[in-house]
Amino acid sequence: MEIKLFGKWDSETVAVKDPSLKSYISVAPVLVPHTAGRNSKKSFDKSKMNIVERLANKLMANQNNTGKKHETLAIVEEALTIIENRTKENPVQVLVDALENSGPREETTRISYGGIAFLQSVDVSPSRRLDTAFRNIALGASESAHKNKKTVAQCLADELIFASKADMQKSFAVKKKEEKERVAQSAR
């Protein structure tokens, strides 16, 4: 029996193009992406968690959706269905492409030397790249749905589609990534 995500999408054919993110993006086949916190005991076990569940967890981060995992999983499933209808591609592949395009490769850190503080450009670890990408995608979807006729699922689908195409004009996550990398480049 073949296990598909939500009984609809095959994650076996999903390819991660970025070699640095390969070991951190888990697209292991699961029926329902809900581990009930099994991967929260050790530091880097979140890299074993399915990326769809990590996206749902990030959507639960704001005040209104805290603890409503079933509701956020329904939002993610609806968004993936919208993506499949619009792009005619595997929506899990679109999610992976969006994560690759919206994670910053370098950012700045504050260094104090002799009482003078300045910014120094540093490379970003793959784990932090993914965390930042998830955060910005979820934030972009919830901000665009605020005071809008569109549902959160429609806004999440838009954000993922635009981020997978690396559209800086329409994607909040890609815009934030470019902004961080531009600041880091000026701090070299």
UniProtKB/Swiss-Prot annotation:
Keywords: Ribonucleoprotein, Ribosomal protein, RNA-binding, rRNA-binding
A molecular function (GO) term: structural constituent of ribosome
One Pfam family linked to the record: Ribosomal_S7
Coiled-coil ranges (or none): none
Keyword Cell wall biogenesis/degradation: no
Family affiliation: Belongs to the universal ribosomal protein uS7 family.
The protein's name: Small ribosomal subunit protein uS7
Gene: rps7
